[in-house]
Each structure stands twice: as structure tokens, then as C-alpha cells.
UniProtKB/Swiss-Prot annotation:
Changing residue 75 to V: In strain: CLIB 95, CLIB 382, CLIB 556 haplotype Ha1, K1, R12, R13, YIIc12 haplotype Ha1 and YIIc17 haplotype Ha1. This is DUP240 protein DFP4. InterPro entries: DUP/COS. It holds the Pfam family DUP. Belongs to the DUP/COS family. Changing residue 124 to V: In strain: CLIB 95, CLIB 219, CLIB 382, CLIB 388, CLIB 410, CLIB 413, CLIB 556, CLIB 630, K1, R12, R13, YIIc12 and YIIc17. Changing residue 103 to T: In strain: CLIB 388, CLIB 410, CLIB 556 haplotype Ha2, CLIB 630, YIIc12 haplotype Ha2 and YIIc17 haplotype Ha2. Residues 66-72 are extracellular. Changing residue 86 to P: In strain: CLIB 388. Changing residue 96 to N: In strain: CLIB 95, CLIB 219, CLIB 382, CLIB 388, CLIB 410, CLIB 413, CLIB 556, CLIB 630, K1, R12, R13, YIIc12 and YIIc17. Keywords: Cell membrane, Membrane, Transmembrane, Transmembrane helix. It is found in: Cell membrane. Residues 1-44, 94-235 are cytoplasmic.
Amino acid sequence: MSSELLISNSKPRPEGLRKLCEGETVILPRDITPSKCAYFLKQNIVFISYIFIHIIITIILNRLALSAHGNTLIIILAALLITISLFLLLLLPYLSCSRYKLRCLDDDCKFKLLAEVITHKPNMDLSTWDRIAYDMNQFVYDRRICADRSFFYDGSYCYQVFKKLVATPYLVNSNMNSIYADLEMRSNGATNINDSGNSSLHIELGTYIFKALAVFRNSVDKYWEDKYPEMGVTV
């Protein structure tokens, strides 16, 4: 895929830029490929090409099965390919979801994501996640998990993966004691494989999860305080 993330001296699309600090502009795949559909096609071009070829073969076999030259073997193969084709088509939406993105990340990438949240202190304003998405794209590329610097389309994608990694399991229950208890359980050697793609979370990762959530919660509280001071939100 040709899209690249650059800290710019280049000539990017002006409407998509997000200035994160004075004199610096981050370019994300969103700025190079405004269409999410086009981005998805580029990201999964190999898999989609395979599905396309598979469907063509399936159609040919089905025509043979329906013709006078059809035999039992061809009919069985045609039925099998139809089933596989349906499965592959149903798999396509999964490739665009945050759960799949998270499963692509190794433990180092998860540590990096948590460290970025602690460093940059993002909030509910999705533009505050753009810098994190940029840094993560570079890191994932360096780890050879992605062929180019376009793993996260924009900050909102990065935020969704962060929620899958930490926010969804922990923020369901706001009782901080339960978080400590869970971290203690993990430190005793427990491992957990859940539907968010978190496998064998070590105590070190659990500690970063706790820190990142605390930073994120404080940033969110400050965001709402600044936006609606009359609400009197307190941390």
C-alpha cells in the first residue's frame, strides 16, 4: 500500500490535517485516503483478491455441476466452495473491527499503546488521539506487523482499540478496589484470554493498564469540566 505517515515537509491534503503542536503536523491515512472504504480495500487487498478468485472458481464449478457433465465429485466441491465463500464474506466485517486490530498487536505494541496514553493524556476529543495513532503506526511498522505506516486509519480507530484493550473490561465496574484485586490475581500467575484479544497479560501490562486508565479518566474529567463548567464535575 502506498499511503505513508509523515511529519510533514510534504504537501498533504490540507483539509485532513490535525495540528498537534506548534510547527508540527501529523499526517494519517485518513488524510491521504479520505474514504474509509478505499482504506479498507487497500489494507485487505490480498484477502479480498483471494475471495474474488475463490468466488470465480465457485461459480465455474457450480455451472459444471448444473451442466450435463456434472458428476458427484464436482457437485460436492461446488457445495463446499459455496460454504467457504459465505464464510469468507462473513469474515470481511471482522477485519475492520477493533477486536481484529487488537489481535494483530503483540505485547510490545500493547505496552506502547498504554505508554502513549500515559504520555499524551488523550480525552474524549478524538483529535487528541491522532498523535497516538501516528506514533503507533510507526511503531507497528517498525515491528513488521504492518507493511506500511497505516495500521490505524485515524485517532478514532486507535481509541477504539484502546477501549478494547483496557477500557471495556475495567470501566464496566468503576470500583477501583476491583481493579487492584484483578491486578493481584494476575500477579499470582493467572492468565486470561478474553474476547478483546488480551492473551497472557502479565502483571507489568496490568500495571500499565491501571496507570493508563487513571490518566485517561483524569483527562476525560478535565475535558468535561472545561466544556461544561456548570456541571461541577470533580475527579
